[in-house]
Amino acid sequence: MKNKKRFVPWLIAAVIIAAFAVIGKKLYDLMFGGSLAVTTEDLKNGIIACSPAIIFIVVVLIAALIVVVAAGKLKQPKRALVRAQAPIAILLAITLSVNWVILGVEYSVVNSVFAEDVKVSDETMASGRAIADQIASEGIVLLKNDDKALPLSAGTKLNLFGWSSVRPLYGGTGSGDSDTSNAVSLIDGLKHAGFEVNEELVKFYENFRTERPVGTIRLREIGSKRGDFTVPEPTIAEYENANIFEDAVAYSDTAVVVVSRTGGEGFDIPQSITGPDEYNAQYGGLAQFYDFTTQAEDLDASKSYLELSNREIAMVDRVCKEFKNVIVVVNSSNAMELGWLDQYDSIKAAVLCGAPGELGFDSLGKILSGEVNPSGHLADTYVYDLLATPTVNNFGGFAYDNYAEVTGSQDNRAMFVNYCEGIYVGYKFYETAAAEGLIDYDKVVQYPFGYGLSYTTFDSSIAAVEDDGEKITLDVAVKNTGDTAGKYVAEIFYEPPYYNGGIEKAAANLVQYAKTEILQPGEAQTLKITFHYEDMASYDSNGIKSANGAYVLEAGDYKINLCSDSHTILDTYVAKVDKDVIYDDAHDGARSTDQVAATNQLTFAQGDVTYLSRADGFANYAEATAAPANHSLSAQALADYASAATFDAAKYDDPNAVMPTTGANNGLKLADLTGVAYDDPKWEQLLDELTVNDLFSLTADGGYHTVGVESIGLSATEDCDGPTGVHSNYNPAAGPSYPGSVMLACTWNQPLAKARGEQIAKECAEINCAGWYAPAMNIHRSAFGGRNFEYYSECGVLSGLTAAAEVSGATENGLICYVKHFAFNDQDNYRQNNICTWLNEQSAREIYLKAFEQPIKAGGMGVMTSMNAVGPVWAGGCKALLTNILRDEWGFHGAVITDAVVSPWYMDGNLAIRTGGTKMLAFNITNEFYRDLNSVGTVTAMRNAAHGTLYALANSFAVTRAVAVPKWVKTTYAVDAVVAIILVAWEICAICKYRKAKKEDEGTEQ
C-alpha cells in the first residue's frame, strides 16, 4: 500500500502538467492552425521570448532528477521527504513559467487568442449582404453583346463549359481571400435566376477534378504548400470519350464558357508557362515553390498565364464550332488577353465577373436574365498583347551583385525593379501613345479603361458649367433613350496642354466621375460634378518650372472631356489658364489641400534609370522600356541603403535631447483626449503617464492588436485583415465576404463605396476590432501583379476616390482603416527581399501616392507600410515618405503600422519608430527588439510613435470599451490558486508523513 501511495503525488503532478499541455495545445491550434498568420519568424521570436522560462523548467527538472537520485543514499523517512520536493518543485516551476509567459511576455497574443467569442449580428449580416449584392450587380462589366444576345430568356437551358464553371473563383488568396463556405456557386446563381443547367456536363467536370489549385503561397508561413498555377481543363479526347459535345448539342443550343484566373499574396502571375528549369534560370529559383502547370499540353513558353491555355483553346474552338450562341464569363480580377472573343462569330456576348465574393454569382444570374441591367465599367485597360506593354521588361525582380555589405549577409539577397514607364501607366500610356502616333490604338487596345456596355442606351452632354477659376462644376445631363431601366456613369477626363520636352503629361487623365440612379426609359437626371483646377496640376520633379520641384498648372487650354471611357469623348468644355500657377512658396503657395507646399522628397529613389518621355513622340521608348542592363548598386545607393546592418541611431537622434518624463500620475485617460487636437498640450501630459514598458509594448507588439494600458484607460484592441471583408484573426467571427476591390472599383459608384465602409465599421464594432488592415490601394502597374485582385485599379485617381469614399464611411463610424501598402508595393515577387523600387517623383506623386493621398486627406487615421524599398530605403523606415510627405505635406496624424515583420534583416523597428512609423506588425517581441531600449533616443522615438497610435485610438470606438480583467486571466488566477492549495497541501502532507515516520522510528529505537 505504501508503494502505491508513493505514486499519488506524481500522478497529481502528471494530471496538472497534462492540463497545461491541453491548454498549450489549444493555444497552438488557434495560433498555427487557425486564421492567425503566424510565420516561422514569429515562432523563432516566440521561442526566444520564452527561453528564460524554458531554461528555468529544464534546470529545475534536471535538479529534481538529481535530487531524486541523490536522495537514494538517504535513509527513510528523510529520503521520502526529499524526494517529495521534486514533483512539487517541478510543478511550481511549470506554474511560475506558464504565468510568466502568458501574463508577461506573451500576454497580448494570448489575450487576443482567448478573447471572448463574438459574432456579427444577423441584422448586420443581412445589411452587409445587401451591400455585397449591390456591389456585384454594379461591378459586373458587360464587354460584348452582339445581336442583343443578352439578356437570355427565362428558363433558357445552359451548357456550362470550362472546368471553372464548377469551381469558379470568389476572390484571391492571402490577406484578401474570401470565405467560400457559404458562397453561392456560379451554377446555383444561374439556377436562382431561373436557368436550367446541363447536369451531365457538371458531373463530367466534377469527376475530372474536385479542388482548385492555389497559385500562390505565403513564404515562411507554418504549413505553406507548394503553389500551382495549373488551369484545370480536360483534353478534347476526354470530352469526346464522354460524348460531351454531342449530348450538349442535344440538350440546348446555348453555351456558356467560363474562364477563371487566380491571383494572390506571395507571388506574381507567370509571364511564361515554362518548366522549372527555364524559370529558375531566368528568375533565380522561384519555381521551386510552385508549378506553372501540371498539364503537359499547356507547357508553352510563348504564353502567359493570362492567355487561354492550350487545352482551353481547344475547348473554346470546339464549343464555337458546335454552338452558334456562346456567352463567355471572364472570372478574373487580373486583366486577361481577350482577343479571342472577337475571333469567333459564335461568341455573341461576354461579361467580366472578377472576384464576386460569396453572393456575386447570384448577381451574375440576375444580369444574364435581365433582372439587373449591367452598369459596371472597367478599372483597367484590356490590351491584345500583355507581353508588349511598357512594363513587361521591368516587372518581377532583378538581383544585385554587390549587396552583402549593406544587407548583412550574402543570403539576404538585394533585388530591384525599375518603374521605367514613369507616369505612363495603363490608359495614360495608351491614350498618349495614340495621340503621338506611336501606336495604332485599335490594334493594341481591345477594351479601354472605363469601358462598359448596358442593355439600354443613354444620351449625355455637358449642359452647364460653373467656372470661377478655382473650381469647375459641370452639369452633366443624362437621359435613358432605350427601353430598359439602367444606370449611367459620367466619366470626366482632362487633356492638359503639353509642351514638347517639358513637364511630362498624359493625353487623358481621369479627374472625377459620378453615377446616376436607376433611370427608367425616357427618364433624365442631371449630375453635378465638381473638381478644382489644382487637381489638374502636374508634378514638376525635374525642376523645369520650380527649382526644388512643385505641382505646376501650366498656362494653356485644358480640355475637360465627358467620356464613356478613356478613349471615347462625348462632349468637351475648354478651361483656359492664362499663366503658370506654381504651387510652391516662391510663387503661388501650397495647394489648398496641402499643409505645406510639396517639394522633391524622393530624388534618392530615382536612381540611374532612363524614364519614358513623351518628348518627340516617345523617341526614347525602346531605350527606356528595355530590360535593365546594370545589376550593381551604385556608390550612392550603397551609402543610402537602409537595413539592420547599416542602422545608426546617431543619424536620427538629437544628441541634445533630454529623457522624456515617464510614469507620471497626471490623472488623464485616453477617452479625455477624444477630439483633442494632435498638438494640444494635453497629449504631452497623457504621454508622460506611460512607462518605458508601456511605450515598448505599444510600438513593438502590434500584430493584429494594440496592447492595453490600464493607467490611461486603454483596453486591448484587435485589428482584422483583408480588403474583402471583416475576418477576425483570433476567433471565427466574420462578416460577409464582399466582392473584391476591383469589382468595387468597377462600380464607379463613390456613395456605394462609402456605404461599404460604413458597413465594415459596423461589423468591426460588433466583433471588437478597432482596426482594419484595408483598403489596399496599390496600382495595377502590370496585369501580372499577384495581388491585383486586392487593389482597385491601374488609375491612381479611380483608386483614390474609391478609397476616400470607403475610408471616410468607416472612419466616421469609429474604425481605423490602415490603408495599405504604403507605398509602391505593386508586385509580390521578392517583396521580402527589400526589393529596391526605382521611380521618378512625378510618377510617385501622380500615380502611386495619389491613391493614398485622397483617403488620407478624407480623414484616414491609419496607414500600413510596405515590405519593399523606396529606392534603397525600406518603405517602413523612409522618413521622406512617412514624415515629410505623409505627415508634413498631407497633414496626417495617426497610426502607421508596418507590414508583417518577416524579414528583420531590413524591417528594423529601430528605424521605423524614428522615421514616422508607430508600431510593428509583429509577435513575440523581446526587449532586444530595440537597441538600447532605455536610451534617450529610443524612448523619445517610442513616445512619438505611441502618440500617433493613441491619437488614432482616441478617435475610434476603442475608447468606448471598458477596461476589465479578461475572463481567461481570472481563470488563470483561479487555476493558480488551486495549484497553490495543492502544493501547500502536498508539502504539509509530506512534512506530516515525515514527522510521523520519524516519531515511529524514534519509538522503535526506544
Task: Describe the predicted segments one by one.
Residues 1-543, 547, 551-561, 565-566, ...:
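Glycoside hydrolase catalytic-domain context in secreted enzymes
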Residues 568-591:
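Short beta-strand elements
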